[in-house]
Amino acid sequence: MKKTLTLLTSLISLSAFAVDAPYIVATPPADAGRGLIRVSEKEIRHYPGKGGKQMLQSLDNGETWKSVPLHKNYPGATCLGKESPAIAQNPTTGEYIRFEPLYRGNNKNDGVYTTEGGIDGIWSLVKDKDGKFARPGGILRNPIWVNDNKRILIPGHGGGCYTWYSDDQGVTWSRSNVVKSPHHKPGGVHKGTRWNHGMVEATLIELKNKQIWMVARTAQDQHYESFSKDFGKTWSEAKPSRFWGTITMPTFHRMEDGRILFLWSNTTALPEIASATGRGEDAFTNRDTIHAAISEDEGKTWIGFRELILDEHRNNGDYGTRSGSQDRGKHQAEIVQLDKNRVLYSCGQHKIHRRLMIMDVRWLYEKERSSDIAKDGAKDWTTHQFIQKKVGHCAYNRTIGSEVKEGALRLLRLEDETLDNPNQGATWNFPTGDTGKVTAKVRLEKGGSGLQIALCDRWFSASDATVDQFANYVLKIDADGKVNGKQILTPGKTHEIAIIWKGVATKGDASLMVDGKKTNIKVSCNLATPIGVSYVHFYNPATDTDLEGASVLSTHAQVK
């Protein structure tokens, strides 16, 4: 009851003041997903990967950070230089346990470690009664304790997802059954096949009904989910979850007040090209942002769906090779709670892309967002286009795409055979809503080809030509400013368009206002969604060179 009252008080007070957006505090020494650990009330650390001699340390609860030498007792990581081991504190003993991302070979120093005397005490390899080292197989993520802390669960993958479980605090381990997602297949918008790596990188959370919920990365458009009723020993058949996300890592976190926080990339990759066979890693086109949502009812409904950060390098012409050719982007996360309302999280892969950030989760409850291009320069927009030649590790270089000119984003079509698509677009995120209103000031330039405006429940590339097939609502305005033969805009003149949708979960229609006046134009709901609308996507539909295009001057979203 006390937690409920605290939560209600917190939410009521939210309306009394503005909440700061998430902000960067440091760059972690390893890719996000492992190695971030609270040590005391004020101290938090981020450990490095194999070969690392320095760790990142905060002594003021995550606000400031410095690089310091690893403690002499800490056993060096043995797996990958770019990835730290997973380190967790045992809630029963207060000691720490460590797992490498992967155990391979016969390294005598390779195995599960536990501490005696705290994180800077003695680290020892775990051995069973026969003297064998504990080395759970597969690629592993962070452990959780379930069933009143009687069991440790580690999500792993290899040929599908499974869990390793231990009922003796990590001495011996058993493995669950394997759950799999279906292979991606060509068809529809896909001429080729995505990299079919199967169901991998699962995240786990114990629900209040004692079920364990698994959500995992797949090659499909959605993360897949599975449930266990016996604390991770057996798992149900995996099925699509409500969460969009393609070949990106999801992460659950239980807040101290009981709410569930979820970090993932609510993004869809570009359609697969004909040369994609599904047998190897592809060019990743949907890792430029990471999102957060929060649930107060054990995952039945979710609030937020907000971009936490857009990749600072997303428009770079040398995106795929700058500072080396490793994996890159903003997907992957790990979370530490700081206080009642704030969390610290790591996100991203690659030394110039990964970040440590602080978020006040009350920010997820906001119901409005605005962008004035003349003032903000479209810094919170995705506009880039892809140069369709794979470079580095699974990447495309980029061009900036639509640019800000005279206080507006100008969407053109510039012929360039190197691009995935010469048509320019722009996409912008706002808090999700089952019902809401998006208002935009736009101008069809004289001689331009018109404008497509789509409302979506996920991020699409600005230059994705297939958005109209997957958006929840689509408004197509031709070069003359007409919608289905009805004049609504005058080329060369700035207009204010508002799309008002109601009940997207039940496929409710949307209405249209122009310059503050209602029209009789109905915008049908193409696809219902249980997660609400959280994006507006603008696109130049030209079929030939368009040097005039259309302009977007501002946007405002308000949701319920």
Region spans (language model):
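Asp-box/BNR beta-propeller blade signature and adjacent active/binding-site loops
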Residues: 19-378, 388, 398-400, 415-417
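Secretory/extracellular carbohydrate-interaction modules
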Residues: 406-479
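Short, aromatic/His-centered strand-loop micro-motif at the edge of beta-sheets
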Residues: 473-498
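Short tryptophan-centered beta-strand motifs in secreted/extracellular beta-sheet-rich domains
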Residues: 440, 493-504, 510-512
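Hydrophobic h-region of N-terminal signal peptides that target proteins for export
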Residues: 9-18
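Flexible glycan-contacting loops in extracellular carbohydrate-active proteins
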Residues: 521-553
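Beta-strand-rich interaction surfaces with strong enrichment in secreted/lumenal proteins
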Residues: 239, 424-430, 483-489, 541-542
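Extracellular glycan-recognition surfaces and repeat-rich motifs
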Residues: 377-412, 422
